[in-house]
Curated annotation (Swiss-Prot):
Organism name: Thermodesulfovibrio yellowstonii (strain ATCC 51303 / DSM 11347 / YP87)
UniProt-listed Enzyme Commission number(s): 7.1.1.-
Subunit composition and interactions: NDH-1 is composed of 14 different subunits. Subunits NuoA, H, J, K, L, M, N constitute the membrane sector of the complex.
Biological role: NDH-1 shuttles electrons from NADH, via FMN and iron-sulfur (Fe-S) centers, to quinones in the respiratory chain. The immediate electron acceptor for the enzyme in this species is believed to be ubiquinone. Couples the redox reaction to proton translocation (for every two electrons transferred, four hydrogen ions are translocated across the cytoplasmic membrane), and thus conserves the redox energy in a proton gradient.
Keyword annotations: Cell inner membrane, Cell membrane, Membrane, NAD, Quinone, Translocase, Transmembrane, Transmembrane helix, Transport, Ubiquinone
Subcellular location: Cell inner membrane
Protein name: NADH-quinone oxidoreductase subunit K
Amino acid sequence: MIPLSWYLLLSATLFSIGLIGFVIRRDLIVMLMCLEIMFNAVNIAFASFSYYNSNLTGQIFVLFSIAVAACEAVIGLAIVLALVRNTGINHSDEIVNLRG
């Protein structure tokens, strides 16, 4: 059986990659993808904790969290694509120009 520390190391690595990508990159779609990587890292940590505690409640929470993250990704992508299509703004630095 794989120890819990390996799963937590994987989760921390994925979260770090997502956080660094979110902070460094300015493209809105890439920022959304990095945010999803961070959500998946948290889900891996939740699932591994619930598996090692033999508690199905945590795994059910992970399934609901995946569903919420999927809805968030669809709504976020729709907003970003509408913003790009209507204004041509694709970088987070240019959003300041939208203020009226």
